[in-house]
Amino acid sequence: MSRRYKKRRFHFGVFLFFLTVVVIAGVFFIPWVMKPENFRSEKNAIYSFLYGEFQPDSYNAKSLILVDRSNNDFFISKKENEQQLPASLAKLFVIEYAATIADLDSIVPASYEAISLTKPGSSVAGIEAKDYFLHNLFAAMLVPSGNDAAYVVADYCGGILSPQTATVQDRINIFMDSLNVHLQEKGYTNTVLYDPSGYDMDALTTVLDLNSVVNQLLEFQWFRDIISQSSYTATLPDGSTQSWKNTNTFLDPTSDYYNENVIGVKTGSLSDDYNLVVLYRKYGKE
């Protein structure tokens, strides 16, 4: 009996020791695991599975993706290959292509003819018939989503592509034709655009193509600087300034929708379609 009792005491002691070790480890290890920066990739994989597989219909968007930019992993996806109306998000493709045609510091003359193509009731940046830097016009397209700026950019770039073309509309048509070729060559194969402002009910794109073009543009610091501000002041070639308020209310500290972790990108709406590309940063990750 004495030997059996000692043996039981020994086993109980070993059990108690390991139990104590487990409890102590749990006290320190579990809070460490719960920190967002630890086991991030494993947690992301779990969240991606849970939210992507079990809740695709819980979002009212026609199509969407939530992407980890560090590795291009999708947390959430819904009809990502389905073509949708881009509205003003079309300007992202226009800017990406225009930036390959002319330098940011190019001086662009804005003509009355180009500005007058802006459709009544559409968003404008108050572009005047004067000289602008190209990056001024990019900001005017991105911040207040100025359709007038988009026509000026398309007119200018169309003139570079075809210097002999005489009319504004023809230069814009040349730019748009060349843009659509560029889209196919860059792999934006589900995107087709007919109007540089995005004010077009026949244009099509997908959230995957939008993800690709935004990733391309985010390589440029000038783009990040523009899209991250709730208001933007441009200095024009003549030294004057022009300011715009961002249509993205997530950036506005006075808005109920303000979120300090949102650092871009762009809104777009047309008819009953409301589009949004959001760049969200937390713990140094986008």
Mark where each language-model region is.
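Active-site-adjacent loops and short helices of periplasmic peptidoglycan-processing enzymes
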Residues: W32-L208, L217-Q221
